[in-house]
A protein has these predicted regions:
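Bacterial N-terminal signal peptides
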Residues: 8-17
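Non-catalytic cap/lid and distal C-terminal segments of serine-dependent acyl enzymes
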Residues: 21-307
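Bacterial N-terminal signal peptides that target proteins for export
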Residues: 1-9
């Protein structure tokens, strides 16, 4: 047998041995280590068009032995000029969420300020979230549909929206979180936004001109100043933070002073950073930790009050 034949035989034997070993190996499926992101296309009757939303499901959500398990839910709202998928594409939300047993929903709000428009009858982004989105989530997914298991948060425009939902619908949420919130947006005038014309152009279509009824009804500071004591006691816990280099830094400080003066339960943090995804990627981790803690230690039931 020449050297080439011996070499060929050796290769055949080695390959055969490897194949035999492989045939006896049990290949385990890769374990899922990050939460799963699923997109839902929802046909809104109130807004008159399809509004997608993302759902971040817990790592073990699909395990057969957990098919009867229900989860708390955190709604995260995007900012102005953003969309429903910002949280899952601009932050490591799915990775961070893998540590927690909660469902996270990121709705589409377009540039509607999470408000029922005073000028466009079909732009009902506040009613959509309360009357359509939340019921749809609770129908499609295994979420607990009680106040103690529901939280809402957001960044910038979404921070404004989250706080507003907490103030207007305190019986629905146990926790509100605002990151760099545009908390006084309903009071902004054109002169306030000189140099930020693109932002200004989104406001009149939603809130109307001047002191319109829609502006007044969605002015967070006015809403909080006029709340009677029994409604203050019914508010969810409010978490706020803002970067010290953020253009909205002072307005967040002013808002917190109002919370303090009215003795509204809250936590406020000032941190290095600006109005950027780098800041929000870091701070959403704190929101998840706070939500998980709140869900584990639910607040007492709060009597429903009309918004």
């Amino acid at each position: 047998m020449n050297k080439f034949t011996r070499a060929s035989l050796l290769i055949v034997l080695l390959v055969s041995a490897c194949c035999a070993q492989a045939a006896n190996l049990r290949v385990e499926p890769a374990k899922q280590t990050s939460a799963r992101v699923q997109t839902v296309q929802f046909a809104s009757k109130l807004v008159g068009k399809t509004l997608p939303y993302n759902v971040v499901l817990p790592v073990n959500y699909d395990k057969p032995e957990l098919r009867n398990t229900r989860y708390p839910v955190l709604y995260l709202l995007h900012g102005l000029f953003g969309h429903y998928d910002n949280w899952t594409t601009h932050t490591k939300l799915a990775e961070y969420a893998s540590q927690y047993e909660m469902i996270i929903v990121t709705p589409e709000g377009n540039d509607g300020w999470y408000t029922d428009s005073g000028t466009a009858p079909r732009d009902k982004y506040e009613s959509y979230l309360v009357q359509e989105l939340i019921p749809d989530v609770e129908k499609r997914f295994r979420v607990n549909n009680n106040r103690a298991s529901r939280a809402i948060g957001g960044l910038s425009m979404g921070g404004y929206g989250a706080v507003k939902f907490g103030v207007k619908y305190p019986d629905m949420f146990a926790l509100v979180a605002s990151l760099s919130g545009a908390l006084d947006a309903a009071t902004w005038s054109e002169s306030d936004l000189r140099g930020f014309e693109s932002i200004w152009r989104t406001l009149p279509p939603v809130f109307g001109a001047g002191n319109s009824s829609v502006r007044i009804a969605n002015d967070l500071q006015k809403l909080l100043r006029e709340l009677p004591p029994d409604r203050i006691a019914a508010l969810p816990f409010i978490y706020l933070d803002c970067g010290t280099e953020d253009p909205l830094f002072q307005s967040n400080r002013d808002f917190v002073e109002l919370l303090r003066s009215r003795k509204i339960a809250h936590e406020y943090r000032e941190l290095p950073g600006n109005h950027s995804w780098t800041y929000w990627d870091a701070q959403v981790q704190d929101v998840l930790r706070l939500a998980a803690k709140r869900f584990a230690e639910p607040s007492p039931a709060v009597k429903a009050v009309a918004p």
